[in-house]
Each structure stands twice: as C-alpha cells, then as structure tokens.
C-alpha cells in the first residue's frame, strides 16, 4: 500500500481527501503545517501532497527543506493557482501543481 503524507491546514479538506485517497487504496498521514510535515516525513512516504499557505512553515519553505534531504514526489495542492505560482512551485522542485477546486478523479490520476 502506498503511503501519502497530506500537508494542509484546512482540516475539513484534509478529512475529505483522506477519505477519498483511502477509498482508492492509499494509506494517508496528515500534517497540518510544514513543521509537523518535516517531523513525520521519512523514507516510507511515497508521495507528498503539499499546500502552500499554512501557519508556522509555509509550503514553499517546507518544499525547499524536503528537497535538501529527499527525492520524494511532491504535488502542490493550493489555492494559489496563478501561472507564476505554478512555475515557482515547479522550479523549487515540485513534481506537479494542482490548484484547489480540483476534480477528485484528476487528483487520483495525477497520483
């Protein structure tokens, strides 16, 4: 079973995504900010779903730290969907970038 670390401060969204992804056969661990994500991240995680705007440590800073130690696939899930935000996320090492208000099937297909 593939393990996903879902990092987002929106508790309602994380609950819904956890349910969706578990129905698709994934194991899901939730972190509500970047600091918590960094403490939970280890070599058993297969994919990271990462929000940008979070308290304590935002997604951009979290992604920078992750890339120093891990080559884990990262999909940015964020309300910031401008072209500039997408390019910045990809340049910093995200493997994919999906603006919120996404279709569940699209998310699962990208995973």
Language model regions located:
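Receiver (REC) domain active-site loop signature in two-component systems and cognate sites
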Residues: 54
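C-terminal output helix
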Residues: 82, 101-111
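Active-site residues of response regulator receiver
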Residues: 51, 78
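Acidic catalytic/metal-coordinating carboxylates
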Residues: 32-33, 58-61, 85
